[in-house]
Amino acid sequence: MNAPVDPKKLIKGGLHDWEVIVGMEIHAQVSSRAKLFSGASTEFGAEPNDHVSLVDAAMPGMLPVINAECVAQAVRTGLGLKAKINLRSVFDRKNYFYPDLPQGYQISQYKDPIVGEGEVLVDLADGASITVGIERLHLEQDAGKSLHDQDPTRSFVDLNRSGVALMEIVSRPDLRSSEEAKAYVTKLRTILRYLGTCDGDMEKGSLRADVNVSVRRPGEPLGTRCEIKNVNSIRFIGQAIETEARRQIAILEDGGTIDQETRLFDPTKGETRSMRSKEEAHDYRYFPDPDLLPLEFDQAYVDALAEGLPELPDAKKARFVSAFGLSPYDAGVLVAERASADYYEAVAKGRDGKAAANWVINELFGRLNKEGLSIEATPVSADQLGTIIDLIGEGVISGKIAKDLFEIVWTEGGDPRVVVESRGMKQVTDTGAIEAAVDQIIAANPDKVAQAKEKPTLLGWFVGQTMKATGGKANPAAVNALLKAKLGIE
């Protein structure tokens, strides 16, 4: 029986409402210095064919040798996805011919993958969450890269990428919108980065998505799916799903049928186009690779890797909510990147967690976004930001002065305490000095004084004038208290 459909997720066609069904195959490059079956380097950006071993080039007589670190990284990823780790898995040959595949086959895993079923909890923008099932994770070799822009009449092949270890993470068709799909890939990338098993850099091709899209009328069986290959940004994933769903709906409402095929997304034209008919498993003639023994390890090996796992995003988010009193939303923002979470935790240590979150999210992240910088490149250290928060708490500076201080530390650096002293930024706490400023403003504005008793909101105007007169240095609480007393406002 089909679950009820959320009307907000339906796509309106010309004749009917339609439900989009999305499943994802994520190809994540394993973080490892060497390739899956050779000792060649995986460094990105080298000259073409600089990192190619005899195994990668498929020279006769060369035998693959499994890289143990790639196996460990796959197991760590499986544990991070709450998945079943298979103690015995098998490498198979996936047979097809392509210029950048020198062996004439890809070493992959078919019937017996290293990781079985798991799940990913995905938080959505509207505050809801969904659980996306993971069908499997298997290890496989990447192919090389064909270069078509080096010569007007010839194509070249770069085998630097050939043999690099990939984890193919296959989801169940549990996604029901482009927004859910984007949120899923974002969360999966966050988990991989926390684990240190893939850097998730889509610009470098470290994370690529094959997106399976089909549409159906609510309550009807699944439709025929099309696979959109190698989508290389989260924004493009969303656009590709929307575009392909619309294409399929138009065909079905016109009385046509959907061909199961592989397609490419063209972001400049905003369309998907046919690449080839979709292959089935039998087209690849899978069989166990005779050069590789089955991959076997024991539960003790898995348990040892599990003990070394870092705190993952969901657990960290729950801890931030309980330990620091944060809202789930703020905690989610902070744990989205491991470096951001570590920075926040350093700022919040021994301080008010909510105040620290406000400064990190609103001031720091806001400025980083404006400047196009990552948290790793911030010129304001966690110690410096923590000191600014301390100065507010100690009553040395006001919130307004703190923002000015943050700007100085951002652009010039320095110890915030020293900056406050050297630039005379301490707030005025001497009630006599504040009272003199208040009296002067009251004397200069008798008409507003009369109005204030009838309209208490004018208090804000007097506070602003007092702060202006004191260069923003007056203690706001003292200003408020004095003005209320002198204006007779309760």
UniProtKB/Swiss-Prot annotation:
Catalysed reactions, semicolon-separated: L-glutamyl-tRNA(Gln) + L-glutamine + ATP + H2O = L-glutaminyl-tRNA(Gln) + L-glutamate + ADP + phosphate + H(+); L-aspartyl-tRNA(Asn) + L-glutamine + ATP + H2O = L-asparaginyl-tRNA(Asn) + L-glutamate + ADP + phosphate + 2 H(+)
EC code: 6.3.5.-
A Pfam short name: GatB_N
SMART domains hit by this protein: GatB_Yqey
Residues in coiled coil: none
GO molecular function: asparaginyl-tRNA synthase (glutamine-hydrolyzing) activity; ATP binding; glutaminyl-tRNA synthase (glutamine-hydrolyzing) activity
Domain of life: Bacteria
BP-aspect Gene Ontology terms: glutaminyl-tRNAGln biosynthesis via transamidation; translation
Disulfide bridge map: none
UniProt entry keywords in alphabetical sequence: ATP-binding, Ligase, Nucleotide-binding, Protein biosynthesis
Family: Belongs to the GatB/GatE family. GatB subfamily.
Assembly and oligomerization: Heterotrimer of A, B and C subunits.
Record PANTHER family: GLUTAMYL-TRNA GLN AMIDOTRANSFERASE SUBUNIT B MITOCHONDRIAL AND PROKARYOTIC PET112-RELATED, GLUTAMYL-TRNA(GLN) AMIDOTRANSFERASE SUBUNIT B, MITOCHONDRIAL
Protein role: Allows the formation of correctly charged Asn-tRNA(Asn) or Gln-tRNA(Gln) through the transamidation of misacylated Asp-tRNA(Asn) or Glu-tRNA(Gln) in organisms which lack either or both of asparaginyl-tRNA or glutaminyl-tRNA synthetases. The reaction takes place in the presence of glutamine and ATP through an activated phospho-Asp-tRNA(Asn) or phospho-Glu-tRNA(Gln).
Protein name, as recorded: Aspartyl/glutamyl-tRNA(Asn/Gln) amidotransferase subunit B
